[in-house]
Design a protein with these regions (language model features):
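Active-site- or binding-pocket-proximal scaffold segments within functional domains
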Residues: 1-393
Length: 393
């Protein structure tokens, strides 16, 4: 059998194929061809977003509340990770290429999936019933070194049950594409729920969303303007700092939906983040064959848009109650157009900054201020902290 590509796409919260306007995950799915030009199969697995479970044929108010709660708390993510993992275990063969894409909590799902693969490898088909055991190893307590990826139990598990086309029993992940990863589990980190979230969320800390050595290329489009505490960003902190062009986190204008799609009103912005991902696939010679002409796109870095407007009044009410939290852009982010640095302000944001009068969202304003002040900013913060301590604030 010829080598093939296995493509896992996990959609955003409350998003599925029935939505009136597709997310970038769905638009990418629509653009992927069944085969490459040289006849290599491209097999797609799509997982709808968290909180999309149909409770009943004619959902009541209570059913809709359950659906909203499921999306807000990330209920069911373990089941979704296992479904994606099972798909890969049943279909992967040595020589195949693996691609992972996700938006919102779907991005968190594929990052956790990559963590599971890094820990346990992919199981041989005759050992597929060991999936739950693999997950139990992955769910190790942080202090259990034996179950860590380099621990003796994890190594022994991979050697006995995983496909061993590589010495370490782990397949490579060719490309990971992400749109605005947000915290997927537990109580939102909102001011009014801070102590409760701290106590509850510690039970979900086992998820490994770090960028491991098995991932060849990873690209993450993140929102500059999103401030809802229920959409707290999970950035990639382990980016390759050698500017190899194979890992990058780029900051885009607009809120959560303006980066990952799913809202017609911000399509000109979200299409920019989608086109950026297409370009990164090409630049990294990913081998994934897609036809962007199969989907209609409209680019508008300078388009008008409203952010943080929920599709449903109940969702908007809840998110407003839970408060806001401004995102912090790392001071080392490059502001050079077409940069291949590991952290950048996107070309879309740079164009908007110069093309839309008065557009300078708080997070971007703070970033430029910190960048201009440099070490003086850190010194100022230290002095303010000393004053606060002396006044016992």
């Amino acid at each position: 059998m010829a080598d093939k590509s296995l493509i896992v796409l996990c959609d955003g919260t409350w998003q599925d194929l029935n939505q009136p306007f597709p997310t970038n995950v769905v638009r990418l799915l629509e653009a992927i061809a069944p085969q490459t030009k040289d006849g290599k199969d491209q097999i797609v697995y799509y997982d709808e977003g968290i909180g999309t479970q149909q409770v009943s044929i004619e959902p009541s108010l209570i059913d809709n509340l359950i659906k909203v709660a499921g999306g807000a708390l990330g209920l069911g993510i373990d089941h979704r990770i296992l479904k994606c993992y099972r798909f890969l275990c049943l279909n992967y063969r040595p020589g195949d290429s693996i691609f992972l894409f996700g938006f919102s909590r779907g991005a968190y799902t594929v990052r956790s999936l990559a963590g599971l693969i890094y820990n346990c490898g992919l199981l041989k088909s005759e050992h597929v019933r060991m999936i739950t055991h693999a997950y139990s190893i992955y769910r190790k307590p942080n202090s259990d070194k034996e179950r860590a990826p380099s621990g003796s139990e994890a190594i022994a598990f991979r050697k006995k049950y995983a496909i061993t086309d590589r010495p370490d029993g782990r397949p490579r992940i060719k490309f990971m594409g992400l749109w605005d990863t947000v915290k997927a589990l537990g109580i939102p980190d909102a001011p009014v729920l801070r102590q409760l979230s701290k106590n509850v969320n510690k039970h979900y800390e086992f998820h490994d969303h770090k960028l491991s050595s098995i991932i060849d290329a990873a690209f993450h489009a993140v929102s500059i303007e999103e401030e809802r505490s229920t959409f707290s960003l999970i950035p990639i902190d382990q980016l390759n700092t050698t500017n190899c062009g194979c890992h990058q986190q780029a900051w885009f204008p607009g809120g959560h939906g303006a980066v990952g799609g799913g809202e017609a009103s911000v399509a000109p912005l979200s299409d920019c983040a989608l086109q950026w991902m297409f370009e990164k696939l090409d630049q990294n010679d990913s081998g994934l064959h897609f036809d962007a002409d199969r989907i209609q796109m409209s680019f508008g870095p300078n388009s008008k848009h409203e952010i943080n407007k929920g599709k449903f009044r109940i969702i908007e009410t809840i998110t407003n109650f839970l408060g806001k939290k401004r995102r912090t852009i790392p001071i080392h982010a490059d502001v050079t157009p077409k940069s291949i640095a590991s952290e950048v302000i996107s070309d879309t944001a740079l164009e908007r900054l110069h093309g839309v009068k008065g557009w300078l969202p708080p997070s971007l304003h703070d970033f430029y201020l910190r960048k201009k002040l440099g070490n003086r900013w850190d010194n100022l913060l230290s002095e303010l902290q000393e004053v606060a301590t002396s006044l016992k604030l």
